Amino acid sequence: MDKSSGELVTLTPNNNNTVQPVALMRLGVFVPTLKSLKNSKKNTLSRTDATEELTRLSLARAEGFDKVEITGPRLDMDNDFKTWVGIIHSFARHNVIGDKVELPFVEFAKLCGIPSSQSSRSLRERISPSLKRIAGTVISFSRTDEKHTREYITHLVQSAYYDTERDIVQLQADPRLFELYQFDRKVLLQLKAINALKRRESAQALYTFIESLPRDPAPISLARLRARLNLKSPVFSQNQTVRRAMEQLREIGYLDYTEIQRGRTKFFCIHYRRPRLKAPNDESKENPLPPSPAEKVSPEMAEKLALLEKLGITLDDLEKLFKSR
């Protein structure tokens, strides 16, 4: 629904865009690859609290689940995200029979952004590990009281089968999660920016997060962007990664921004977003906003803000805490 006009807008995926559930974009399910050898050899099991976003699903509402957690291998942007895009496209474009969709393997590879010129072996080496990681990602819905616990455990994708000799792919989804694939709070994610950011996974991840935000978003804290990337390096190094990624997004023409400081906290003010990487005919529609003036903060408040940042507590975390009370 377009809030400005009241018109119902249908979002349809094609080769240049995909419909991505907002929850998966904001939560950081898909993150940059851990580059260092030290980090890459660590246990890369990822655990994400998805309660705020996914308790809106009818499954959670019907069963009264009040906690949702996503657990599984760390999903990267360069391969796993593109495979997930292919899965979304497959269910959107092909006839779903029961809980399964079937299509040619070569077409599925194309939907994942893999050139058809690659050999069958190369296709397998890229798609197979990604399908295993995505199918290995668990979503658990639960509710616990003083005496009892109820829990429903499922997967991002229930099963995947392919046969390159027969040129076939079969994907199976949990019917109770079809709503996640067709979430009513979704945005049309342009793939043009993703393609322009090849091998720049941090910029790709921040793009999926920023593109999921509403129009004229509030300033985004540096800490929030660090959390979205879910890196394991020291904070100062993570800050450098975030700033470099933001600059890469500006270089491809996706956005413009200003970095400001309020007290001890750094923020990014987004002036405009251009997922098509070109200016619209009427640039006034972008409503560029000037950066908000820095607020005067007392020394006592500055100390409190510094302590929160040191503990890794963001303003978003505080807002969630107050809402839950």
UniProtKB/Swiss-Prot annotation:
<dbReference type="GO" id="GO:0006276">
    <property type="term" value="P:plasmid maintenance"/>
</dbReference>
<keyword id="KW-0615">Plasmid copy control</keyword>
<comment type="similarity">
    <text>Belongs to the initiator RepB protein family.</text>
</comment>
<keyword id="KW-0238">DNA-binding</keyword>
<comment type="function">
    <text>This protein is essential for plasmid replication; it is involved in copy control functions. In vitro, binds to the DNA repeat units, BCDD'D'', EFG and HIJ.</text>
</comment>
<dbReference type="InterPro" id="IPR036388">
    <property type="entry name" value="WH-like_DNA-bd_sf"/>
</dbReference>
<keyword id="KW-0235">DNA replication</keyword>
<dbReference type="GO" id="GO:0003677">
    <property type="term" value="F:DNA binding"/>
</dbReference>
<dbReference type="GO" id="GO:0006270">
    <property type="term" value="P:DNA replication initiation"/>
</dbReference>
<dbReference type="Pfam" id="PF01051">
    <property type="entry name" value="Rep3_N"/>
</dbReference>
<dbReference type="InterPro" id="IPR000525">
    <property type="entry name" value="Initiator_Rep_WH1"/>
</dbReference>
<feature type="region of interest" description="Disordered">
    <location>
        <begin position="279"/>
        <end position="298"/>
    </location>
</feature>
<dbReference type="GO" id="GO:0003887">
    <property type="term" value="F:DNA-directed DNA polymerase activity"/>
</dbReference>
<protein>
    <recommendedName>
        <fullName>RepFIB replication protein A</fullName>
    </recommendedName>
</protein>
<keyword id="KW-0614">Plasmid</keyword>
